[in-house]
A protein has these predicted regions:
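Noncatalytic alpha-helical scaffold of FAD-dependent oxidoreductases
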Residues: 1-249
């Protein structure tokens, strides 16, 4: 399935295989989480973050699935340290085009499939299960917005931060020809409740207010977010869709 491709003419006579019910988290241990392929990023975040654990390099939206992340070579704002999502996969199961079910694909078992799956977007087979690494985290992050008018200064500072790897998360924005922003986020152990920008889940007002562009446009210096809100800051309704109706100027 996926966007506007699901009803294309060439698919009319094809056999549809429904995978939406592969949505169970199978097990969570200290260093890994094992899921069926249609488990979403949002499901994972809400199970692991309360345990002070997270999957590195998840894309920043709540409805991406782990199977889609693996086939699509996903990444996030801590990928500059941890690599792509695929670099943090322990093993996975896949049904190939000839019907074979290949289990426990890893760096040492069917390594051709392990290293070849990224960027295939479902053409190699149907992923049914994915086991991912877990790393330590905190429940909150402090986000700093570093604003620049000079591209050279912006680029120099961004390059240095990437090299030093001191930030837990980092991304950068070119807002206009002479307006640039580095956005870095770091875990914090404690924060006062009144300092947290958003505390309510699935609220349109939350989604509107926490949009990273809103903070940049308002020239914020910093704010605090729950880690789950930061990790899902580009969820579809929050970012891709809502901006079309009321864009920030």
């Amino acid at each position: 399935k996926g966007h506007n491709h699901r009803d294309l003419q060439f698919k009319i006579k094809q056999t549809k295989i429904e995978t939406a019910q592969l949505d169970s988290i199978l097990s969570i241990e200290k260093d890994w989480i094992d899921c069926e392929a249609s488990v979403s990023v949002g499901q994972i975040n809400r199970k692991t973050i309360p345990k002070k654990k997270m999957v590195p390099s998840l894309p920043e939206g709540d409805n991406f699935t782990v199977g889609g992340c693996l086939g699509g070579l996903a990444l996030g704002s801590n990928s500059y340290i941890h690599g792509f999502f695929n670099n943090n996969v322990v093993d996975f199961d896949i049904v190939l085009g000839n019907g074979d079910l290949v289990r426990n694909v890893s760096k040492k078992n069917h390594s051709d499939l392990y290293y070849g799956i990224g960027g295939t977007y479902g053409t190699m087979g149907i992923i049914t299960r994915v086991k991912m690494k877990l790393i330590d985290c905190e429940s909150y992050v402090k986000i700093n917005y570093l604003h620049y008018k000079s591209f050279n200064e912006f680029y120099s500072d961004f390059s240095l931060r990437i090299k030093e790897q001191k930030d837990d998360f980092i991304e950068a924005f070119v807002n206009s020809k002479n307006d640039f922003t580095i956005v870095c986020a770091n875990f914090v152990k404690k924060v006062r409740k009144e300092e947290i920008l958003i505390i309510k889940d699935k609220s349109i007002l939350k989604q509107r207010h926490m949009c990273i562009y809103a903070q940049i446009a308002n020239k914020k210096d910093f704010n605090y977010l729950r880690l789950v809100d930061y990790l899902e800051r580009y969820s579809y309704s929050a970012f891709w869709g809502h901006y079309l109706y009321t864009p920030y100027k």
